[in-house]
């Protein structure tokens, strides 16, 4: 019963649609009708500005971290915190508070990793920032980190780098997280291939996107 309650709490935390609610209640803007139509951090930055974007990013990360820490806070050791945290990602992607139409789960996934495996989170953060600087695309950086994350959880335990041994729950959840991110970025992948993806106003833009 405790596990079911924790899953429900984690899902409800993930279902909090920060960008959507900030847009509606503070800016009178429905993010679904602007930009990419996504309710996540990137579109919030683009449509509502830096302040709203930072708040959205922070809350979306923290809700993943908090969901992961629920078993630890409650002193429950019969279930992996990472497993519970995954339900915040499901909530963010399919939120009950927003007709099950959510974001791409990048920030919330980062929060889950931060709460359970901070060293692995920092490693992927470096990959994300490096890719962002080289190619000037949030979407490509997110996809790259997802792919690298899958490869890393499979390879690192073999060499004892960051991950010292295999944890089948951690490995499985990381792969599911990464696949969710990749699948949710299908439209972005199409735009990248056409060189029409949205860019951030810094970096090298090595792929020469036209930013239409």
Curated annotation (Swiss-Prot):
InterPro entries in UniProt: G3P_acylTferase_PlsY (IPR003811)
Biological-process GO terms, alphabetical: phospholipid biosynthetic process
UniProt GO molecular function: acyl-phosphate glycerol-3-phosphate acyltransferase activity
The protein's Enzyme Commission number: 2.3.1.275
Catalytic activity: an acyl phosphate + sn-glycerol 3-phosphate = a 1-acyl-sn-glycero-3-phosphate + phosphate
This protein's pathway: Lipid metabolism; phospholipid metabolism
Topological category with respect to the lipid bilayer: Multi-pass membrane protein
Keywords attached to this entry: Cell membrane, Lipid biosynthesis, Lipid metabolism, Membrane, Phospholipid biosynthesis, Phospholipid metabolism, Transferase, Transmembrane, Transmembrane helix
Subcellular location: Cell membrane
Disulfide bonds: none
Pfam families, per database record: G3P_acyltransf
Keyword Ligase listed: no
KW Signal (keyword) present: no
Enzyme class: transferase
GO cellular component assignments: plasma membrane
Chief location of this protein within or outside the cell: membrane
Residue intervals passing through the bilayer: 3-23, 70-90, 110-130, 143-163, 164-184
Described function: Catalyzes the transfer of an acyl group from acyl-phosphate (acyl-PO(4)) to glycerol-3-phosphate (G3P) to form lysophosphatidic acid (LPA). This enzyme utilizes acyl-phosphate as fatty acyl donor, but not acyl-CoA or acyl-ACP.
Family statement drawn from the similarity comment of this UniProt entry: Belongs to the PlsY family.
Subunit (UniProt): Probably interacts with PlsX.
Name listed for the protein in its UniProt record: Glycerol-3-phosphate acyltransferase
Organism: Streptococcus agalactiae serotype V (strain ATCC BAA-611 / 2603 V/R)
Gene that encodes it: plsY
